[in-house]
């Protein structure tokens, strides 16, 4: 029987942070859980970041992932928005790192290409493919993106391990 690995995928954001946990057994993928963390919008930035950090820590304790993956920051037209997204990414990355988990980072285009086959896929296409790759999974756009990040990591960790075995 193949070794089972749990991966926590994170789609960072200050308003909505998508998350998803998948199980990988050989080439089989299955969804464990997914959802969205919504920090209080009226709270100061520091409190919203603490909410994200604590929520991801709770997810790590509840679902026991072996590894985590998060979407890389992209260059936004608004520098202030990009900086705040960077803060959210850091808060989300610290919780699994503190628990001793490796945290991988993937560009959005690579995630889309891994799941849909094209880096230019839209959110609806990503969500549709997540539903196909993880049958029975009905996720919101943010949670589907997080599951896609976890799937991307599963594909890349498998390719890396196959490459090292050659």
Curated annotation (Swiss-Prot):
Its main location: cytoplasm. Keywords: Cytoplasm, DNA damage, DNA recombination, DNA repair, DNA-binding, Endonuclease, Hydrolase, Magnesium, Metal-binding, Nuclease. GO terms for cellular component: cytoplasm; Holliday junction resolvase complex. GO terms for biological process: DNA recombination; DNA repair. Pfam families: RuvC (PF02075). It is found in: Cytoplasm. Belongs to the RuvC family. This is Crossover junction endodeoxyribonuclease RuvC. The gene is ruvC.
């Amino acid at each position: 029987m193949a070794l089972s690995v749990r991966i926590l995928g994170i789609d960072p954001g200050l308003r909505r942070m998508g998350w998803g946990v998948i199980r990988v057994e050989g080439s089989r993928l299955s969804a464990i859980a997914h959802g969205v963390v919504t920090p209080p919008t009226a709270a100061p930035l520091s409190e919203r970041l603490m909410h994200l950090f604590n929520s991801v820590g709770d997810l790590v304790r509840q679902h026991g992932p072996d590894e985590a993956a998060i979407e890389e920051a992209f260059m936004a037209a608004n520098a202030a928005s990009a900086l705040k997204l960077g803060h959210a990414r850091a808060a989300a990355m610290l919780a699994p790192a503190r628990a001793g988990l490796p945290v991988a980072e993937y560009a959005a285009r690579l995630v889309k290409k891994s799941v849909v086959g094209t880096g230019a896929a839209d959110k609806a296409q990503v969500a549709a493919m997540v539903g196909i790759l993880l049958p029975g999974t009905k996720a919101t756009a943010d949670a589907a993106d997080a599951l896609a990040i976890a799937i991307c990591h599963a594909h890349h960790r498998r390719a890396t391990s196959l490459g090292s075995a050659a």
